[in-house]
Amino acid sequence: MGILKRNPFGHILFLKKMLIRYLGIMSHRRYRGFNQLHIEGSEIIKNLPDQKVLFVSNHQTYYADVVAMFHVFNASLSGRLDSIKNVGYLWNPKLNIYYVAAKETMSDGLLPKILAYAGSVSIERTWRESGKDVNRQVKFSDISNIGKALDDGWVITFPQGTTKPFRPMRKGTAFIIKKYKPIVVPIVIDGFRRSFDKKGLMI
């Protein structure tokens, strides 16, 4: 891999690798020390194709959910079944993992911007922004970027579009599935609200 090779969004892959390693090492103890992440069903990860996979998950924190998935996916690909023991699996992380996130969330501070570079497909929410209700049309460029990410690799999406419990699923995920026809893998997250703050930055 050339040191200046870029992904379809223009991000330098070498820099992305360094950021994923750093974030993984810094966050690992939160899932294997202060908390104990319990994983089930990760055996399917290793058999998935390299592109066009959509993970559909509930959402409990802004960031801890996604970071945990980066750990689990990379650990599973390196042969660790339902375990993230020994952070060495991040030495050669999968670089084509993306996640759908609100643009306002990923531009609010240095750490969110670093997390965005690591894999965010940032979109404008159509119903809410900065804590206020809005009503606007879907940006076709946002849909196109999600399709671009699927063509390149794996995408994580949160169809509720919020960390609040029991919210209905937004229609966007169904549209993405119908349009791009990815392999769909459901994920259930539980207990993160009790273990982390809302943003998933504090224990």
Please provide the spans of the model-predicted regions:
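Short, flexible loop segments at the rims of nucleotide/cofactor-binding pockets, characterized by
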Residues: 16, 29-36, 100, 131-137, ...
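A transmembrane-helix-recognition feature enriched in membrane-embedded lipid enzymes
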Residues: 1-40, 68, 109-118
